[in-house]
Regions:
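General structural signal for alpha-helix termini and helix-helix connectors
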Residues: 11, 34, 106, 110, ...
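Catalytic cores of transferase enzymes with a strong primary signal for eukaryotic protein kinases
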Residues: 73-74, 93-94, 99-102, 106, ...
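Solvent-exposed, amphipathic alpha-helical segments
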Residues: 27, 31, 96-99, 103, ...
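Hydrophobic alpha-helical segments typical of transmembrane helices
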Residues: 28, 58, 89, 146, ...
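Short linear motifs at protein or domain termini
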Residues: 1-110, 115, 226, 230-252
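C-terminal all-alpha effector/ligand-binding and dimerization domain
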Residues: 2-5, 133, 175-252
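Conserved amphipathic alpha-helical segments that form helical-bundle/coiled-coil interaction surfaces
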Residues: 114-178, 198-201, 213-224
Length: 252
């Protein structure tokens, strides 16, 4: 478990309680989403508090937030665990993305500024460089920034929902596609290169101000990821909710 030493501010003073909550939440959330803390892992409050260098009061608040986000299960009177991965859950996450991302893209693409266009281009270039360097963490950062940049004008509530759905879906993508990849560590150049043609097509449509084409490329990109994740299961289940959402998007 990659937990940091006790956290202090710039003056070397211990963090305030509210800062400690945010610190613990952000670190644990990132470790859960990236699989550093594995699905089903038991979370010992005593151990976590000691490793994080904080008291159990802010830790419990951080864990409450993670429970509310669906990343941790259990309660404070019994054993707490990292939520297991469940392809039915992944199906629902993607169904929601299929429904919301076209709205976000349609709201954003016609409104993009030159700076925002440059930022989208830069994130694709960062992904391409990270793929060649087999740098999974750099790729993950650029990948997230690119896709959320496509919906940045959707409004705070929609964008916040899309960001949360993205983070939850990334947990599955990393687990099923990268950790189960040919080298088992998710850092092969091929795995990171694979989606780059699709990202370039999405980017080209965005830069051209073509929201309809950008949406079509993005939905196709998502369908490929959905299918790849489900194919890792034996036998592959049917992504029922996603299929309904895809059909509705096509009719719209």
């Amino acid at each position: 478990m990659s937990l940091a030493p006790p956290k202090v501010d710039l003056d070397g003073q211990p963090l305030r309680a509210d800062d400690s909550v945010q610190f613990a939440h952000d670190l644990l959330r990132d470790d859960i989403l990236t699989g550093t803390i594995a699905p089903g892992a038991v979370l010992s409050q005593v151990h976590l508090a000691a490793r994080l260098g904080i008291s159990r009061t802010p830790l419990r608040e951080a864990l409450r937030r993670l429970i509310a986000e669906g990343l941790v299960t259990g309660d404070f009177n019994r054993r707490m665990r990292v939520s297991e991965l469940d392809l039915e859950d992944f199906d629902q996450i993607y169904a929601m993305r299929f429904a919301l991302e076209p709205v976000g893209i349609q709201a954003t693409i016609p409104m993009l500024t030159e700076q925002e266009r440059s930022e989208l281009t830069r994130e694709v270039e960062r992904m391409e460089a990270a793929a060649e360097a087999a740098d999974r963490e750099a790729f993950r950062s650029a990948h997230r920034a690119f896709h959320l940049g496509l919906t940045c004008r959707a409004g705070e509530r929609i964008q916040g929902t899309l960001a949360e759905l993205w983070d939850h879906s990334e947990r599955y993508r990393l687990r099923y596609l990268h950790q189960n990849g040919p080298d088992g560590d998710g850092t092969t150049v091929e795995l990171l290169r694979r989606p780059q043609v699709e990202h370039r097509a999405i980017l080209d449509a965005a830069l051209a101000g073509d929201a309809a084409n950008c949406t079509a490329h993005q939905l196709a990109h998502m369908q490929h990821t959905l299918a790849a994740v489900f194919q890792e299961a034996a036998p592959p289940p049917v992504p029922r909710m996603s299929r309904i959402a895809i059909a509705e998007s096509a009719r719209g």
